[in-house]
């Protein structure tokens, strides 16, 4: 399991995840999480409902990135799933860059909507800091790589829509910053990659 240095967990989180994994015979277990800000903890999913996914269902849920998020920190994994997998260096959103690869090695995944992880929202964090086109480009790259992997493995032929959506968002956001050579290069690369999915309806 993983815990970000800014965050904290309930004392029984790993016991909960381990029991969930063993009881369901899965390779990955997931809990939901709180978002902590200003001394308040808010959880979007806290019903206690349980879901068991096949490998492909779990990867599709990661691509949607709403219920099952591309976080490493709210999950417990069998160690063997990380064979041959290395976190990218000098790149933000590294969880998104590898989470789907770890899921690909699993047979089944279980999730229970019981929050056990506390994600701290602070000024200056990766997700909350002032807009940075390079960071959003890293996010786009990771989504693009995830979608290409999903398509190559025949997991979900509609996954390309998420490249289009993320690309449109990035292009829209670049309008907020002063033009530069690096920004122009990002825009060109994003548009080129988006054109690979011209067939997608969104």
What function would you assign to each model-found segment?
Residues 2-4:
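Ankyrin-repeat intra-repeat helix-capping/turn positions
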Residues 7-112, 120, 124-134:
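Donor-binding/catalytic cores of nucleotide-activated saccharide
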Residues 23, 180-202:
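Membrane-interface aromatic/basic loop that binds lipid-linked glycans or pyrophosphate carriers
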Residues 115, 142-145, 167-170:
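Amphipathic, well-ordered alpha-helical segments in soluble domains
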Residues 137:
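Contiguous mid-protein beta-loop-alpha structural module that forms a pocket-lining wall or clamp
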Residues 141-162, 199-201:
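C-terminal, non-catalytic tails of nucleotide-sugar-dependent glycosyltransferases
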Residues 150-154, 174-181:
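Secondary-structure edge/capping motif, primarily at the C-terminal ends of alpha-helices
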Residues 162-174:
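Amphipathic alpha-helical repeat scaffolds of TPR domains
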């Amino acid at each position: 399991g993983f815990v970000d240095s800014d965050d904290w967990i309930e004392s029984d989180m790993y016991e909960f995840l381990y029991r969930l994994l063993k009881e369901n015979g899965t390779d990955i277990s997931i809990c939901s999480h709180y978002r902590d800000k200003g001394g308040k903890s808010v959880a979007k999913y806290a019903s206690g409902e349980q879901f068991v996914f096949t490998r492909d269902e779990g990867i599709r849920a990661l691509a949607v990135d709403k219920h099952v998020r591309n976080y490493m920190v709210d999950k417990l994994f069998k160690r063997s799933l990380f064979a041959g997998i290395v976190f990218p260096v000098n790149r933000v959103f590294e969880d998104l860059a590898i989470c789907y690869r770890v899921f690909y090695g699993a047979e089944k995944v279980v999730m229970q909507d019981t929050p056990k992880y506390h994600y701290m929202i602070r000024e200056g964090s990766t997700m909350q800091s002032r807009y940075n086109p390079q960071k959003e480009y890293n996010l786009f790259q990771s989504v693009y790589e995830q979608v290409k992997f999903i398509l190559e493995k025949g997991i979900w032929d509609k996954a390309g829509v998420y490249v289009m959506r993320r690309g449109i968002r990035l292009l829209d956001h670049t309008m907020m910053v002063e033009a530069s050579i690096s920004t122009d290069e990002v825009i060109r690369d994003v548009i080129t990659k988006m054109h690979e999915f011209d067939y997608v309806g969104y």
